[in-house]
Structure formats: structure tokens, C-alpha cells
Amino acid sequence: IFKREGDFGGGADVFEKFFLETILPDTEKRAGLDNPERQLVGISLSGMFALYAACHTDAFSGIASISGSFWFTGFLDYYRSHPLSPAVRRVYLSLGAKEPKTRREPLNTILERTEDVLGIVREEGKEAILQMNRGGHYVHRGERLEEALRYLLSGSEWKGEFSL
């Protein structure tokens, strides 16, 4: 994708195991939480990871992918053959309106790929929305996170100042 950087090295399965078996239990223990309802939110590559992880575990009831890297070669085919866990009830997707305007391939397919993901999620019977925001990939992260959490926790769409 970028000339000066190497290809992405994988490792999602190793991280997923570490996250589910170490990070979550340790964090919940320290916070005094017992069997909480969990939402998994990611931005960019971690946004793609959030959806990927939700195909393998019933640990989350909601998934948010903010500018998820669904352009990643092979992801859409993988997702089509690995549905989300039945535990997932809601999925929130968002993009910055400038993201699909790049000339760089395959990044310029991000809107089409995200719409494909939205369609698959809905075919699985999940509640899902795609929210467009002003700006590009990492713009207005705080507001986009708030929009995601409001939707996942309430099922109600909330549009902030930078939503379209």
C-alpha cells in the first residue's frame, strides 16, 4: 500500500487470543466487573479486526468499525464465509466522506467494501448502520467514537456536529 512500509504481517489470531484470554479478564477483574455486556470498537485496521474477532467469539454484543480497513485483500471473501457470532446484535460502521476519494488502490474501494460489509451484516439479521462523517480517515475520532457507542448501547442513531 505504502512504498516505504512493508506489508501487514498478520498476527490477528495471536492478538485475538491474547486479548480474549489476558487483556479482557485482567481489565474486568481490576474494574470489578462480573460478566459485563461488551462492545468491541476499532479504528482502521483495528476496525477490521473488531469484525474479524466477532466471527470467532461470543464475547461481544456490539461491534463498531470506524473507517475499517475492509479494502484489505481477502477480507470480504473471508467474512462472507465466516458469519458473526449469534451474540452480536448491533454493528456500527462509519467512514469519512473523503476516504473513498483517494487515487491509491485498493484504498479507493473503501466505501464499496464497507457497503458490502453492511449488506452482509444485515443479511445475517443484525441491526446495522453506516454513518458518513465529514473529513477523512482519522478525523473527528472522538465524536465518531461517541456516535458508535450511542448506537451500540441504545440502538438509536445519533449524529454529531460532523455527521453527514
Residue spans of the language-model regions?
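Non-catalytic cap/lid and distal C-terminal segments of serine-dependent acyl enzymes
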Residues: 1-164
